[in-house]
């Protein structure tokens, strides 16, 4: 099963910001092709100061992190890096609504990648067989 690894460097966040993005009511998802040859997922979480104090920012990131770990392996594409950006409503919205937003955004990004990819073979969905073999 592919691991979900997190970004640590600012340059990684800036690189992903140049790719595709999808904005929903409660969050923004940015994605770009991964530079890594591993089939692991690389993910970043961001919450700016304009959404609230440290408690609100950390709560927003915790909620995003929880739902991403729950849904990314099922809906995400291999060789794609994701950055989830919290909005002011992320910490207070219904958990199921946030889950729907995350799934919608991931599917929308996947559609963009598959349509705009020059070589569709380099982006593969993680199949159940691949998950079980790892």
Please provide the spans of the model-predicted regions.
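Positively charged, solvent-exposed patches that mediate nucleic-acid binding
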Residues: 1-134
């Amino acid at each position: 099963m592919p691991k979900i690894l997190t970004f640590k460097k600012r340059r990684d966040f800036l690189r992903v910001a140049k790719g595709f993005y999808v904005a929903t009511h409660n969050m923004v998802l940015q994605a770009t092709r991964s530079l890594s040859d591993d089939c692991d997922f690389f993910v970043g979480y961001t919450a700016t100061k304009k959404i609230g104090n440290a408690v609100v920012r950390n709560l927003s990131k915790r909620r995003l992190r929880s739902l991403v770990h729950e849904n990314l392996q099922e809906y995400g594409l291999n060789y794609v890096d994701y950055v989830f950006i919290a909005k002011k409503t992320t910490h207070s919205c219904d958990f199921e609504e946030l889950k729907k937003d995350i799934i919608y955004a991931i599917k929308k990004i996947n559609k963009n990648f598959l349509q705009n990819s020059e070589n569709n073979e380099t982006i593969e969905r993680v199949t159940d067989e691949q998950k079980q073999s790892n």
